[in-house]
């Protein structure tokens, strides 16, 4: 009986610790930290108005960021070709937005290549994120 209780306690502790580790990993960065990183790489702070213009402008092709994320990135968007629903991009409306640097890097790389036919510069990322952070309920 003692071994059973000891084993049950070990399983419970591991389950709790595993859940805490998963939560910590899911939010390993913040939008403000991402903005700081890209601003430093760009050598200038992110500019919200420049980010708004960039976000809504078609960049030589058929699409803009707003084509999928919506002109109001405070609401759900919809992928222009697949129709897949996209969560709000503005951090105040989606607490998970910009909290996983690997996902952020992956999606910026993919989406910038779709919209611009190249990767976004650090300044462009900083501007867009400054704009998204500026959007409040």
Task: Locate each region found by the language model.
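Short microdomains enriched in Cys/His and/or Lys/Arg
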Residues: 87-102
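N-terminal signal peptide c-region/cleavage motif recognized by signal peptidases
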Residues: 21-23
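Bacterial N-terminal signal peptides that target proteins for export
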Residues: 2-12
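The canonical Cys-X-X-Cys-His
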Residues: 60-72, 128
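Stable alpha-helical elements in mature extracytoplasmic
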Residues: 47-50, 64, 100, 104, ...
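C-terminal capping alpha-helices of c-type cytochrome domains
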Residues: 105-137
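Short cysteine/histidine-rich zinc-coordinating motifs and their immediately flanking basic loops
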Residues: 77-84
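Electrostatic cytochrome c docking/interface patches
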Residues: 27-59
